[in-house]
Amino acid sequence: MQPQLNRDSPVKFIKRLLVFSLICIILGVTTIFGFYFYVKSDLPDVATLRDVQLQTPMQVFSQDGKLIAQFGEKRRIPLKLEEMPKELIEAVIATEDSRYYEHYGFDPIGITRAAFAVLASGSASQGASTITQQLARNFFLSNEKKVMRKVKEIFIAIHIEQLLSKQEILELYLNKIYLGYRSYGVGAAAQAYFGKEVKDLTLGEIALIAGLPKAPSTMNPIYSVERATNRRNVVLQRMLDEKYITKAEYDAARAEPVLSKFHGAEIELNAPYVAEIARAWMVERYGEEAAYTSGMNVYTTVDSKLQRAANQAAINNLLAYDERHGYRGAEKELWQANQPAWSTTQLSEYLSNEPTYGDMFPAAVLSVEEKSAQVWVKSYGVQTIAWEDMNWARRFINDDRQGPLPKSANEFLAAGQQIWVRPRTQDGAITAWKLTQVPNANTAFVAMNPENGAVTALVGGFNFVHNKFNRATQSVRQVGSSIKPFIYSAALNKGLTLATLINDAPINQWDESQGTAWRPKNSPPTYTGPTRLRIGLAQSKNVMAVRVLREVGLDETREYLTRFGFKLDQLPRSETIALGAGSLTPVQMAQGFSVFANNGYFVEPFYISRVENPFGNIEFSAEPKVVCHRECSTELDEFAEQDAASPYAPKVISEQNAFLTREMLYSNIWGGGEWSSDTGWNGTGWRAQALKRRDIGGKTGTTNDSKDAWYNGYAPGIVGVAWVGFDDHSRNLGRTAPNRNIEDDVSGAESGGKTALPAWVEFMSLALQDVPVQQKAVPNNIVRVRIDRDTGLLTNKLDSSSMFEYFEAGTEPMEYVSEHVNESIYSTSSGEELF
């Protein structure tokens, strides 16, 4: 007899199953709510994502928008989603979160699929975190692998999905994600790995970047090409699987070679000393964290055209100085004659780690012939140096002595040596390589707009990487004869004129404080007797400057010089001030000469034009006091304080004084007289005549023993100052013997006109291209009268013994020339002749 089946069994089973399911659901919901309330107090406010400011580096630009530098630990180029290629977005979604548009921040299906994949393969081949979860982790959580961190991540992701749209989440994610080499976001990664903007990436490059979030340190194409290639191919396969690309596109992208190297920020203008000024200014104003992470764009006053001109002129001139003093030998010896030469692989690897200074490259000598040498140049491989590009290399003995001219390259080069070379270029293409060396001396160059004080170009030294000390702003050096225009301006203010005669004769004065005689001398030590003030400044007559100082008075002169921004403690309280014993920076000299260039106004140098935040809003805008070109309330009043609210710069010398001083500075370049009648003469700045412009002027400066060489001058809208010297103040610039192997060789003692002026001339030749000649108008209250060249007195003669001269009205001579020349020598108020 069969047992009776329990007809209620299926019903009971279903009931039990439902009860069990309900219990599981209740437990699940309870667990979820329990987890939620447990972590609720620790959950961040995701609403902050609406106003999130991604950590973005500070960028420094020229006034015309050329990138100079980027500062900040994290490289990031924030982009709008619409600025990103569609293929890039699809590649990331296909690889990181294929169900991105179907879930609400947390994807149970994705987790289940990943779990089965782990069980099947024994390894975590698929990620379980959605893009939103990754965003939550990147913004609010650490990377530690703990259950509670994962729980928080899920809840935060759900909150994010409620707050932001899918497009907004994607944009944040693609700008936030770390992709290796300090690059955060796809914009920075495209620049770092390929030197491109994201819109210019190929499909293969897009896939490579999209594959980086999984392991940015080990799968990037710089660290491992093989791993990066494999990961790229996985991304391409996922894009094909999701039907984002065709099979033909897939095959073409897989066939792309992986060609990647590190690209820093794409610097468009070499101005590192200016960049450092901007960086320090930003840190002082906003604090270090805000300066480096808030994405500020700093626009400096630098003009890219003028900065490039200054870079070229300053470095060319410094290397020309260095080369005429001789070759100091190779940087080091890599292998000796009895040793095997290095392989190309060794050379390439070694030289890749050696610094490059501007356009100066390290190289290894491979072989040497009588009139040529074969070298391996960093980044350029095998190159040849011709004889004409190295025959300058006579031996350096000391700063004053050089060896004989070389007759063969074997005299100074040998295989195995590491040397330095520079390219010769034509129309941007390299045509040859020239032997050079890292200079021992250094240089500075400053260009300033005299209308408002904007520093439009600045070179602080030979190379910022080589030495970060900024000689343009920090190096306080004796200025030599550069100080004389300011002393002569004081003399004009005292009542002297351009025609005043000062005795150009030796001085022999006992100095009780030193217990010895003081004998200032001209350089060269030649004397012309009674000489007009114009000639005295133009030819830089030392003894005349001392006598002019005596007439004005030492204390009065020092006080007068403070009008130009010089400090009293920078100006010695002795007559040596007339010879340039005062010490100033190149920027101070540019500021001082700006007063002459702008008709008498004192402008403050500044470097930062404006600061913009990442949204384009202006955080700071410079408001410099500018020169007044119309009727202003600004009056000259012995440098008295003027209205601080005025937009105009204070007037510190009269327009007439500035004009007459410019006349003397003009003569420093163009001289005077008539060469055809033997009355012609040159000033110490005669080399600037090469510019063929009559709207320029300046003054040389050479200190005792030629330790410092200066040229300070102006042109329309520009004041330029060039300095050359050694950082070691005890070392002088020396002298050179003639070298017929150097084009335009200059021999003899180094000086302002020989050592610094060529940099000024080259700069102005580039800066003034397409700038028409602009003569300043003669001011009111200036008269022009005919005088005798020798005496400075009035004359009726129309021959070469006469000339026209400018005077401030009321100071022109009233007396006509006589035969008694000595009677016209300027005398002091006490009636004593200035001898």
Placement of each model-derived feature along the sequence:
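Non-catalytic, structured segments within soluble enzyme domains
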Residues: I32, S123-S379, T562-R563, K567-L568, ...
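Short, well-structured active-site flanking segments
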Residues: Y101-I111, Y184-G187, T246-Y250, F469, ...
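A penicillin-recognizing enzyme superfamily signal
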Residues: T300, S304-Q307, N311-A313, W342-Q346, ...
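N-terminal type II signal-anchor transmembrane helix
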Residues: M1-F61, R99, V118-L119
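Conserved catalytic neighborhood of penicillin-recognizing serine enzymes
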Residues: A120-K145, K199, E266-I267, E451, ...
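Active-site SXXK
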Residues: V92-I93, M239, A310, E370, ...
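Mid-domain, small-residue-enriched loop/turn segments at the edges of structured enzyme/sensor domains
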Residues: A517-K521, G553-Q591
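Short active-site loop at a secondary-structure junction
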Residues: I77-E82, D399-N410, V438-T443, H466-F486, ...
